[in-house]
């Protein structure tokens, strides 16, 4: 989905909670070529009576989400995820252990610092829903996070040899992919480099993607997907 005004979920007339996890350059031919334009499209999920949660993004993008919320729902409806509440315990290809006050010890089956931030968005959303009267048990939250899977997001396909598949396709995603290679894969090789198999659609910023990943490449094989 495109996430916002043109997304299929926008058929919901009055969502209880609208969450904008982050805003970056993506689907620019449809959403616009600046962050404020993209944010304006994302803001299409904000409806009267909705509580709005914003994760992260450039100040000019957040300003659009906040202003739209203020205009449609009132200033009291706007909330922002506080990532400083995250405390990392340990992380590996097997998953991530962390705490997020006041939920206590939690675990993700996924790795990557961005998945911690996604989890923080989820936990903040749970708090906002509880404020609205929804009964969401702590055990359900813990079990949900521990069992959550996200295909093609630094997904470990094989252990011997280690093969990881990542569908990152915008600058924000590639930055996360680069950080994951540096943290999880580079330490497992003598020279800190890995073999890359890479294919990029024509409308993506492939130059930025290649520049970010090239320092970790022992070899590169490219494919050309239909686009």
For the regions a language model picked out, list residue spans one by one.
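Active-site glycine- and acidic-residue-rich loops that bind
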Residues: 1-3, 59, 200-202
């Amino acid at each position: 989905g495109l996430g916002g005004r043109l997304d299929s979920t926008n058929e919901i007339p009055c969502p209880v909670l609208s969450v904008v996890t982050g805003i970056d350059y993506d689907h620019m031919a449809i959403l616009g070529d600046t962050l404020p334009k993209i944010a304006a499209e994302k803001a299409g999920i904000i409806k009267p009576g909705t509580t709005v949660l914003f994760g992260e993004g450039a100040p000019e993008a957040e300003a659009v989400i906040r202003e739209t919320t203020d205009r449609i729902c009132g200033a009291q409806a706007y909330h922002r995820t506080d990532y400083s509440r995250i405390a990392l315990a340990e992380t590996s290809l097997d998953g991530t252990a962390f705490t997020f006050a006041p939920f206590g010890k939690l675990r993700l089956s996924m790795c990557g610092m961005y998945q911690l931030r996604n989890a923080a968005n989820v936990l903040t959303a749970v708090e906002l829903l509880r404020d609205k009267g929804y009964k969401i048990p702590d055990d359900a939250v813990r079990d949900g996070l521990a069992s959550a899977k996200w295909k093609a997001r630094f997904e470990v396909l094989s252990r011997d040899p280690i093969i990881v598949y990542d569908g990152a396709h915008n600058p924000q995603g590639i930055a996360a992919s680069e950080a994951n290679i540096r943290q999880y894969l580079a330490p497992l090789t003598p020279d800190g480099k890995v073999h890359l198999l890479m294919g990029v659609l024509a409308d993506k910023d492939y130059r930025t993607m290649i520049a970010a990943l090239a320092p970790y490449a022992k070899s590169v094989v490219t494919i050309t997907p239909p686009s």
